[in-house]
């Protein structure tokens, strides 16, 4: 690896204990110890790009998604094969009479019945063994807990703070002070904590004269109780089943209110190369309901009903900023009931198709 201080190419022996043997200065990460792609220069480079060279601040969660070296997701697989009990329950009643017939017969009949009995037993013994079903899952390398540990322990102990422009959004992090908004003109309803911290720390709601409301999708209706009904609502959510249903259900509950869906659309990530795909452990949502309520295509509804989802926090920060800005401006000029299911998706990029029938796998920024 390359020393982040003197740029010397270091062998394993020249970087023992995360200290450069040439300049004798410590560094935080070593790919050999902390995993592929985990080195100071790469983390700094990705953080600089994410913050637009210092113009924006980003969260540790956003940096984690951007610095991942691998992500993959797989759907559930049904059980297949025959249970041993069933195999022998069928085979023994057939094989036993044949063995008896062979034992008490002579000549050709004994040979044929004996061979048939052996064939039945052999088929039962060699039949495909039952493989239990497997639930879907996903994998991101490094894991979020591991990445946070590296940032909190190794990086802070080496440099005294997180990379420039990166803020902690963990559960123990202090709350971010939000710039005051005198008379808000709109509401931004955000269901992702990392994205809400990103918006607050960059003063985006105040700049747009919007009130930021953070809530889980299931609690979104209650979170809007204290918000004046005249204010338009811009909804930010993951590309998930609950996220896709949120804006349509809010429109039904508040027919006199502008509700603009600016969440991450499934069409932008389902077949997009490089998008992060994850699998939820929550009970599946019926595909028919997703089509009827959210107006999704058959393919998108099936993808979500299989448990797949994609996090809003994985969207590049500059793209996220531009989408939120455009969505609030659009909501301010819209009329109640005039927005359809596709409105709010106009600023999101279309997905780049991937070969059908393959496991969802994406790689993060180059690990070099």
Give the ranges of each region predicted by the language model.
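Acidic beta-strand-to-loop metal/phosphate-binding motif
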Residues: 228-242
């Amino acid at each position: 690896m390359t020393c982040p201080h003197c740029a010397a190419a270091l062998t394993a022996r020249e970087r023992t204990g995360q200290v450069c043997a040439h300049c004798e200065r410590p560094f935080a990460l070593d790919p050999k110890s902390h995993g592929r792609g985990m080195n100071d220069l790469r983390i700094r480079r990705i953080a600089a790009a994410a913050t637009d060279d210092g113009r924006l601040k980003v969260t540790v969660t956003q940096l984690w998604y951007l610095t991942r070296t691998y992500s993959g997701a797989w759907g559930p697989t049904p059980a297949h094969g025959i249970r041993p009990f069933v195999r022998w329950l069928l085979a023994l009643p057939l094989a036993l009479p044949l063995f008896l017939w062979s034992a008490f017969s002579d000549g050709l009949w004994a040979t044929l019945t004996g061979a048939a009995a052996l064939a039945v037993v052999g088929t039962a013994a060699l039949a495909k063994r039952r493989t239990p079903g497997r639930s879907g899952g996903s994998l991101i390398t490094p894991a979020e807990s591991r990445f946070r540990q590296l940032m909190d322990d190794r990086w802070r102990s080496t440099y005294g703070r997180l990379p420039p422009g990166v803020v902690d959004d963990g559960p123990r992090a202090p709350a971010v002070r939000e710039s005051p908004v005198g008379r808000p003109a709109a509401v931004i309803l955000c269901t992702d904590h990392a994205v809400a911290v990103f918006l607050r720390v960059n003063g985006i709601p105040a700049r747009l004269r919007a009130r930021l409301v953070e809530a889980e999708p299931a609690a979104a209706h209650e979170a809007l109780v204290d918000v004046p009904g005249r204010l338009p609502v811009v909804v930010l959510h993951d590309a998930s089943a609950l996220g896709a249903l949120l804006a349509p259900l809010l429109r039904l509950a508040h027919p006199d209110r502008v509700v603009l869906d600016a969440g991450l659309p499934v069409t932008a990530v389902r077949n997009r190369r490089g998008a992060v795909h994850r699998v939820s452990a929550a009970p599946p949502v019926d595909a028919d309901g997703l089509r009827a309520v959210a107006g999704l295509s058959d393919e998108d509804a099936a993808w979500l009903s299989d448990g797949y989802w994609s996090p809003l926090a994985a969207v590049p920060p500059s793209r996220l900023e531009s989408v939120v800005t455009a969505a609030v401006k659009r909501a301010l000029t819209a009329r109640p009931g005039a927005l359809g299911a596709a409105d709010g998706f106009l600023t999101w990029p279309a997905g780049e198709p991937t070969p059908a029938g393959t496991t969802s796998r994406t790689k993060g920024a180059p690990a070099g």
